[in-house]
């Protein structure tokens, strides 16, 4: 779901853990004989663009953006034109003027070279990200000895910490990457972010809740869980 207000990887991890622990998530995965083990956290996407920075909602009207899935729908709802070129085609799409902007997490802007085509990057739009769970086969998990199962579960916090520390290293040097490449860091004003959340977030959230409830999945309960967990994480300084 776009524009939930997640700002940090620590908040992302907290929300994922809460959702994964909910019985509805376990039941959903059990259809494929799978058990949710842990998240592999990915930073919030932000956009790089060419030309003048876009830091007002009205400036997204007609903007051609490489954004897929829910993020594409969110940008479309504020007048942008999403395109779903593959990640490997994003650089050429920017270079050739097929798109004005590309939405990726920082590491992907580096990996796919889109940062090299950019004039600016939004530091805090934070429209959303891709949730990437690690799952295991239920039968295989149940077949583990107590000692092996305990070792697997004990390794999860260490694995999450590794993800967080690895990304922290990249984020620490991100400002120097921007400076090196001459990319302007654009801070979106809080009132503009609130506009995005209202126009590009809330309607999609409401539609998702209704769709889940129609399928017998407690969409409202899960949504409320996400918001309460996020508020708690922010309150603790994550």
For each feature predicted by the language model, list its residue ranges.
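N-terminal secretory/targeting leader peptides
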Residues: 1-13, 24-238
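Core domains of carbohydrate- and sulfate-ester-processing enzymes
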Residues: 19-21
């Amino acid at each position: 779901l776009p524009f939930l207000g997640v700002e940090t990887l620590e908040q992302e991890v907290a929300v994922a853990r809460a959702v994964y622990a909910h019985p509805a998530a376990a039941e959903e995965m059990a259809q494929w004989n799978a058990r949710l083990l842990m998240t592999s956290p990915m930073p919030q996407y932000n956009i790089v663009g060419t030309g003048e920075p876009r830091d007002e909602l009205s400036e997204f009207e007609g903007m051609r953006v490489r954004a897929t899935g829910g993020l594409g729908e969110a940008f479309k709802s504020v007048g942008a034109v999403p395109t779903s070129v593959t990640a490997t085609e994003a650089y050429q799409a920017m270079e050739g003027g097929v798109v004005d902007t590309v939405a990726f997490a920082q590491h992907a802007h580096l990996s796919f070279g889109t940062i090299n085509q950019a004039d600016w990057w939004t530091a805090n739009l934070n429209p959303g990200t891709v949730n990437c769970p690690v799952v295991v086969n239920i039968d295989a998990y149940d077949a583990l000895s107590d000692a092996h199962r305990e070792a697997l579960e004990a390794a999860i916090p260490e694995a999450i910490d590794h993800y967080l520390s690895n990304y922290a290293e990249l984020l620490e040097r991100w400002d120097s990457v921007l400076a090196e490449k001459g990319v302007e860091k654009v801070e979106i004003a809080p009132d503009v972010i609130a506009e995005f959340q209202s126009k590009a977030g809330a309607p999609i959230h409401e539609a998702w809740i209704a769709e889940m409830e129609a399928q017998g999945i407690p969409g409202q309960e899960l949504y409320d869980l996400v918001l309460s967990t996020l508020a708690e994480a922010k309150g603790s300084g994550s």
